[in-house]
Amino acid sequence: MSVYAVGLTGGIACGKSLLAQLFEALNTTVVDADIIARQVVEPGPVLNCIVARFGSKILRADGCLDRRFLRQRVFADVAERKALEAIVHPVIRSGLKQAAAAAAGPYVLVVIPLLAEAGGRIGYPWLQRILVVDAIPEVQHARLMQRDSIDAEQASLMIAAQIGRKERLAIADDIVFNDGDPVHLGGQVCNLDARYRALASVFSDVD
């Protein structure tokens, strides 16, 4: 793939969406796995496969996927979650690659929440660089409770369901620490944007 692609990931409530917005403000093209995931499960062949595996109870009255119902079902059962991932993840990966390849600009930022779970570049070998946004567990926990209006126990369960912080940081080429200071965060993003533009210019010359 000729475009210089940077993968962005991070734990839940660490600030992936905020970081993506800051990069967009610098005229960086952003491709988001969550958006593609929503498109993938619209009525069509992928949704038909999901219904065949999980039953029609996962559908709303209008025939669309009841995302909240399915999320609650697979969250409580690892085997069910893996079955769902086996259906949707290959399609999402393909969609991400296509969208990234079509992106304009010197580089593209690809937001992939489960990048570490996919093995980093093992799952996405076309990424040239991986950026992880990180926050200390206490801050992450508090943000999640506030964002989703949930109690401490629910927040802990949601965080525990993800890959560990250590494993996520291990795949990083670059790390942004989101400590809640917008000036500090913006400065980190500006520095990284300049670095990625420089790397992309060299990559374009030799690709």
From Swiss-Prot:
Q: Which Gene3D superfamilies match?
A: P-loop containing nucleotide triphosphate hydrolases (3.40.50.300)
Q: In which pathway does it act?
A: Cofactor biosynthesis; coenzyme A biosynthesis; CoA from (R)-pantothenate: step 5/5
E.C. designation(s): 2.7.1.24
Xref: Pfam families: CoaE
MF terms in GO: ATP binding; dephospho-CoA kinase activity
Question: Coiled-coil ranges per the record?
Answer: none
Q: Does the keyword RNA-binding apply?
A: no
Q: Which reaction does it catalyse?
A: 3'-dephospho-CoA + ATP = ADP + CoA + H(+)
Q: Domain DPCK, which positions?
A: 5-203
Transmembrane stretches, start-end = none
Q: Which HAMAP family match?
A: Dephospho_CoA_kinase (MF_00376)
Q: What is this protein called?
A: Dephospho-CoA kinase
Organism of origin: Xylella fastidiosa (strain 9a5c)
| Protein encoded by which gene | coaE
